[in-house]
Amino acid sequence: MKKFILSLSFLFIISTISHAQQLTDATFQHAVNACLSTNPVDGLCTNSQYGIMPDWDVSQVTDMTSAFSRDESFNADISNWDVSNVRSMERMFFRAFDFNQPLNSWNTSNVVTMESMFGVRYFSSNVPIDYYREMSFNQNIGNWDVSNVFTMKDMLSGLKAFNQDISDWDVSNVTNMSWMFGKSFNQDISDWNVSNVTNMLGVFYDAISFNQDISNWDTSNVLSMKLMFWRANSFNQPLTDWDTSNVTDMSGMFYEAISFNEDISGWETSNVTDMGGMFEGAISF
């Protein structure tokens, strides 16, 4: 009987501890701030009521918006987090310049927004204000399930070295792909289903390394291609078959895209209202 009572007491204690360590939307950001106030780099805040950050139970958290935004030195290993219920990762690592930990095991199947997830820029009237410092993250995230994501605006633009294979991403629900890629990205994304994308504003803005075949992209719903290949210095791929019938803005599209010299004479541009500076500085065209 005594052993039975002791066993019940032990189970109660364990249950209480486990419950205390489980974070919710109401407690998550407070826990992050408290932990990083004492251990801003590795999150090994042993005095936290939730334990050290790598071991946190975040399985009930749905909103991780701006979780580590502007935590410039943050670089904790959070690879084992259960993020299966998270819906927003918007600005999650915004200007977390030093973060470079593996996240490939994350279950992102319920995420709907990854806007500025690894971004560094502020925007003024939808024009980026570039920042002198870029982010370190360059990990494999190719097996992420992004099938429910609708916005990837500015998602990877702040990454100075990111050049990972994300060819298998299902982007069929994405509508906003503006300002998406960074300087080093040059991977095959030819099979992406972009048929629902309406905004390609600056998608390869300053993506100086990118030179992949995207001729088969379904661009029939795109409204803006403004600044799309702005200073994409390496890009020179055929775009002849693109459906541009709904595009209204092509201003600055190939601005200083110094390598581009492809035939786009067959494009339907009857709905375009702005072509200002479309080929300015495109010296090969």
Regions found by a protein language model. Give the residues of each.
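Sec-dependent N-terminal signal peptides
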Residues: 4-15
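Negatively charged
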Residues: 17-285
